[in-house]
């Protein structure tokens, strides 16, 4: 993040093992048909191998895709449930968490070779955050006693053995992030909360009417960014905080118009003063903490989820299934994959820089 906050965690035993069907980018892109039916790399070659750059992407039923070389080659891991991953988080190359559309929380301590179920929730899960092997947070909504749905944050401080619940009424929660075991931020469509006690208590810090706030990231306990868009204009919005979320300032994104809704911010990632925000038109990027911005073009797809292992290595998923990767902070993006390889687009990605093997 300067230490980049990834998301992830846990451990316990009952659930899920590996499948590492080693799948090179050629297998990932060539998929089912004969070699003469379509090119092996319909979007061009995959990135050059970057040993030690690990990433995990979810969205498929019962499994996820994983790379240990920055996206040059991929393998499949299985968690053996007929559910799709909704979010994934890793705090290092070994320790990770995953949540599914069935409300299941899983954890790994070996980089995803084996996954264990640590919690079956009653929530429609939206997001996941983690800071260590013991601490994780799950955001979603569940049925209220009086009818309707109530926004909820579940938290564990013992690797998933026990969980506590905090309710937020009718708020439409969208994302959560933690910089360490105590300092975190929580988003709703138009609100931002902060905590300094691991989520036991939350303080409402900012309300932004007529917005959709979609994503939050932190690089340490003080520096944070929130992305979203203005519901009246469709323009992208990025807010920054230098005091752990107590106060916020709007950043100006001076980029050329790209059509109605084309710049609506979806997800934000940060590393060492670099920022990336996905939008339908490409990736909005800053190399100076948000003072200046550019729209980075991508060769295929509409970027959705994004994660940065460091200031150079960034990976993103798309609506239309190609996976995007950059080894130079987004100056050049490469796309690889084939639409008939994945059943559905990948919806979340986590990335971590570890030692090269």
Please report, for each region that a protein language model flagged, where it lies by residue:
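Bacterial N-terminal signal peptides
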Residues: 15-27
């Amino acid at each position: 993040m300067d230490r980049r906050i990834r998301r992830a965690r846990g451990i316990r035993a009952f659930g899920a093992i590996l499948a590492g069907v080693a799948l090179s980018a050629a297998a990932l892109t060539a998929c089912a048909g004969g070699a003469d039916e379509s090119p092996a790399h319909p979007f061009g070659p995959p990135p050059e191998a970057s040993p030690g750059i690990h990433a995990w992407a979810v969205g498929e039923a019962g499994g996820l895709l994983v790379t240990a070389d920055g996206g040059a080659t991929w393998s499949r891991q299985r968690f053996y449930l007929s559910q799709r991953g909704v979010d994934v988080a890793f705090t290092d190359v070994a320790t990770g968490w995953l949540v599914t559309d069935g409300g299941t929380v899983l954890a790994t301590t070996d980089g995803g070779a084996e996954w264990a179920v640590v919690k079956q929730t009653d929530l429609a899960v939206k997001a996941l955050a983690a800071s260590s092997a013991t601490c994780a947070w799950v955001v979603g909504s569940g049925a209220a006693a009086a009818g309707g749905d109530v926004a909820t944050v579940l938290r564990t401080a013992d690797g998933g053995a026990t969980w506590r619940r905090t309710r937020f009424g009718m708020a439409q929660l969208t994302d959560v992030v933690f910089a360490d075991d105590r300092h975190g931020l929580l988003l709703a469509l138009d609100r931002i909360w902060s905590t300094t006690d691991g989520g036991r208590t939350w303080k409402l810090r900012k309300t932004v009417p007529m917005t959709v706030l979609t994503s939050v990231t932190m690089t340490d306990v003080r520096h944070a960014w929130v992305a979203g868009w203005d519901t009246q204009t469709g323009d992208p919005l990025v807010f920054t905080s230098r005091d752990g979320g107590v106060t916020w300032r709007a950043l100006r994104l001076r980029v050329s118009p790209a059509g109605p809704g084309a710049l609506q911010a979806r997800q934000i990632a940060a590393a060492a003063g670099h920022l990336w925000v996905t939008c339908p038109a490409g990736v909005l990027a800053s190399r100076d903490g948000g003072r200046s911005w550019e729209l980075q073009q991508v060769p295929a797809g509409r970027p959705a989820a994004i994660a940065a292992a460091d200031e150079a290595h960034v990976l993103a998923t798309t609506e239309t299934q190609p996976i995007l990767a950059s080894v130079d902070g987004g100056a050049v993006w490469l796309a690889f994959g084939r639409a008939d390889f994945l059943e559905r687009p990948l919806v979340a990605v986590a990335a971590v820089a570890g030692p090269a093997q």
